[in-house]
From Swiss-Prot:
Binding residue positions for Cu cation A2: C196, E198, C200, H204
Keywords, in A-Z order: Copper, Electron transport, Magnesium, Membrane, Metal-binding, Mitochondrion, Mitochondrion inner membrane, Phosphoprotein, Respiratory chain, Translocase, Transmembrane, Transmembrane helix, Transport
Family annotation (CDD domains): CcO_II_C
Name by which UniProt lists this protein: Cytochrome c oxidase subunit 2
SUPFAM superfamilies attached to this UniProt entry: Cupredoxins (SSF49503), Cytochrome c oxidase subunit II-like, transmembrane region (SSF81464)
Cofactor field: Cu cation
Transmembrane segments: 15-45, 60-87
Any one biological process term the GO annotation gives: ATP synthesis coupled electron transport
Topology, Mitochondrial intermembrane side: 1-14, 88-227
Organism: Capra hircus
Broad class of the protein's primary localization: mitochondrion
Amino acid sequence: MAYPMQLGFQDATSPIMEELLHFHDHTLMIVFLISSLVLYIISLMLTTKLTHTSTMDAQEVETVWTILPAIILIMIALPSLRILYMMDEINNPSLTVKTMGHQWYWSYEYTDYEDLSFDSYMIPTSELKPGELRLLEVDNRVVLPMEMTIRMLISSEDVLHSWAVPSLGLKTDAIPGRLNQTTLMSTRPGLFYGQCSEICGSNHSFMPIVLELVPLKYFEKWSASML
């Protein structure tokens, strides 16, 4: 969950998000080192009285500034590709949920059950209870089992939307006429909030997403009560 004045990411709740956090730290360190080197060279150029006006050719320098950036790019690309493949890999999901975007609400269908579907609308500010979050609470939460692989099928009934839950490392476009898929697995129970992340009209900011991750036995009780 995000909090005021937050400068970093939300706490990771899935293996994918943990990998993304490690990759961010890895890349940020490389950027920091490069920036420090560039600032150091600039400061030397501004303060030193030594100049090299007669240098016409420097093969060694050209070799270094060609090979070194290539190595740095490889160091960034390899872990990035690894995470991309991990995000696309879906092996034997335990549950499939179909998500449809609308202007301006979400519809969910548990395809493994015969008749388990519902719409999820934002609760207006005037109807919020004490302790509930403004513009983030919904009338029907998406209840899912924790520590299980879940496949999300995502599409749209009208315009472009984007189904995003930051703490799970999820962001998948909802495109009319196209069915995208992603996978999620939570390592701990709790409420996890997200929002539509694609400008979709005047009420774009009123399309929250709330996932309630619970142990399997509680999910089974909930699904039985919904049928």
